[in-house]
Amino acid sequence: IALASGAPLFAGILTGVIGGIVVASISGSQLSVSGPAAGLTVIVFGAIASLGSYETFLLAVVLAGILQIFLGILKAGIIANYFPSSVIEGMLAAIGIILILKQIPHAVGFDSDFEGDQSFIQPNHENTFSALLSSLDMISYGAVIISILSLLIMIYWPGIKKLSAIPAAILVVILGIVLSMVFQNTALALSPEQLVTIPVVGSYNEFMALFVFPDFTQIGNKDVWTVAFTIAIVASIETLLCIEAVDKVDPYKRVSPTNRELVAQGVGNMTSGLLGGLPMTSVIVRSSVNVNSGGKTKMSAFLHGFWLLLSLLFIPFLLNKIPLASLAAILLITGYKLAKLSLFKKMWRNGRDQFIPFIVTVLAVVFTDLLKGVAFGMMIGIFYILRTNLRNSYFYKIEKNGEKNVIRIKLAQEVSFLNKAAIQQTLLKLPKESNVIIDGSDSLFIDKDVLEIIHNFKHNAFSKGTIVEILNIRDHYDVSNTKEFVLKIEKIN
């Protein structure tokens, strides 16, 4: 990700360390893992070029972190509550499909695209599907052997009860290192591009030289502030989406505090910018691997950052022997678990209003990128939510009372402006010479436009031989009634 962003390679590792140690310490999410985000690579690459230096860009990252802290204090995390469930499910399934499609080339030894890329259009000008076709012409048999053996371990090892205490993913990495060393100087040897690449530090002075610090003299540069606002908004949205998604796959169904998460991410980004790292987010792929590997608390995210730091300091040469094919096998299994056929069947059974936003999100994310795809899915999801609300603004019942129809219309708890058209059409279509009862006994709030329609209907009904009775509907409703109701529920819970 650092390479694709045009940043120093060390910046990516540093961001992962800070995401693990700093963010996990503050975050209230038990399973999310933070680090450099593939979704920000285009923004970062363009920002470094437009600002003229990496040091100036780091200042924008620091400011973005401060802005995120303010967003958390202002409780902007509440917007996560408005992400439709079908869209979040679609995002998870799409990430699973992307993992499978993107990791197949790495599994066969074709590593032209950087590890972690989730966009349909790749930096090397290929797309997800053309890269798959290209990989068929560039198969490395050493990588294929490693990935097949790794997949078999990932599938069958957890079923061996006596040995399952050792995580399959750890075994896959060890096997990959051993085989990459065995294959050296043979026809199956892996090229450097097919292995993990991290900076090797030879001394304390070399290690300290890797850190880059922000240029605070550019604090008055408006372009720096523009980049800072862009990173803060995009990173916050991506984080909130990830938090919602991780809560869905949490076996214990815990709910993460979103405002606290924004503060944690802000502190993380501020720290990352001060030390020379990249902007970070909570990352769904790393978080999903955490869940699938048996992580239960945020200690796993913290330790991931801690071990990453120790590995960088003491065994970087060993990490550089890990084949990307081994990591591809782990991510292929993660992708399969996120995009199981059973999920598609479940969403289909849930009805059209759930399945259409779900499948649109899946397709949009796969064929664009995470943020654009989710934004498109959100539009479809919100359309179906509004459509459902319009239809469910009242209960309609016709009873017989002698020769006349008695029509009872019972209004919902919340009747907003959006329900105006549906209620108006219903009232206009009522048969003449009926007795109509409009009951608002369950309503905490009725929009004034809807009240006007009801009173106008009663005023004009006499000319049509219709008798209208209005029950438990006030002349005015205050929005605070709804707030009061919500507060009461929270107190009860």
Language-model segments: residues:
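Transmembrane helical cores of multi-pass ion-transport proteins
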Residues: 1-380, 384, 392-393
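The feature marks cytosolic C-terminal regulatory regions of anion transporters and related permeases
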Residues: 337-492
